[in-house]
Amino acid sequence: MEVLAMILAGGRGSRLDILSENRVKPSVPFAGKFRIIDFTLSNCSNSGIYDVALLTQYLPFSLNEHIGSGKPWDFDRRDSGIALLQPHEKPDGQVWYTGTADAVKQNIEYIKRKNPEYVIILSGDHIYKMNYNWMLEDHKKNNAELTIAVKTVPWEET
């Protein structure tokens, strides 16, 4: 099963206040050893998804530096790996992403060129552990057009 993971990692993260003043939210340190993005990247690697596109926009420098070649997640492969996709001027003159859906839309040519069987769109600023294969298997079993993974969380914990 050929899967392309598109990780949205370009948001400003204003609710983190000073922590994201000079870096994008997925690049914010976590537990002194990790960055928030590490959770999503580890989930991909642990699920056997090695074709990953990271869509960045706001202050991408520390995130790009942290990701590097993707070696810590085994993304430094010859025929797959990690691609850092920043917004760039298109023939229609559009440059910046205007939101998450627009970030994916502006990279549709990249998706077409990769021609994966499945595309998983993930957030780069969530902290969780998940095996994406379970979701993909359920998606295939139900012959679904779209699958969204959610978890109910009590209001007090949000």
Regions found by a protein language model. Name each.
Residues M1-T158:
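Unchanged
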